Amino acid sequence: VGELEWFDAYCKLDKGPGAANELMHLLRNAERDAASKGVVGVRDYEMAENIDTWISRFSQGLDGLRVEAGIYPERLRQAIDDGWHTGDELPGSHGLGHVGAMKMISDGSLNTRSAYCSMPYSGIRPETYGTLSYAPEQIESYMRLAVEHGFDIACHAIGDEANTIVLDCVERTHAHGSIEHAQMLKERDIPRLAQLGLAASIQPQHAMDDRDVITRFWGN
């Protein structure tokens, strides 16, 4: 089972019997727990109708955190048609909720050996470099559409070649936002993040998750 198939299955979980009520209960607990630890805001990149979902949640009193409701490329055109832009306040949120960035997943992950790399993974036959979720021209096209209609981008890129492709697309489209994870970078690409005004959105836990995987599987 590939990641895209898993994503499709994962998105069906929220539609199960009683899932909506259980989810609200879990979210309220999560908000309280986050606030107790000093967390004041989150970015929601669930594969769902996040804008409409958070308008509904704020109307139900789920207002313990600031929220940026992101969207995925497949929902970008609908968000544009509905008149949304990154930074727009969500109705009923009293300033706590805003439209977030367009989230893209450009490649896979290191643990599944699907992060897209410039050299093949060690010890795997047939030889593999990982996978891209979108062709480079698709990544550029979605970024261009986002820029033209006032959306920031948040692009997942883990493998070094995926990061190069994303940086190239940002350079051509003048997109603004972040690279999510930015986990492996070619040395020449590191300064490009600053030159292009991109944030490197890094999760320290991945350094622990993938330390041994990099040593074992990534190409020399």
Kindly label every feature range from the protein language model:
Residues 54-58, 79-85, 163-174:
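Distinct, well-ordered alpha-helical segments
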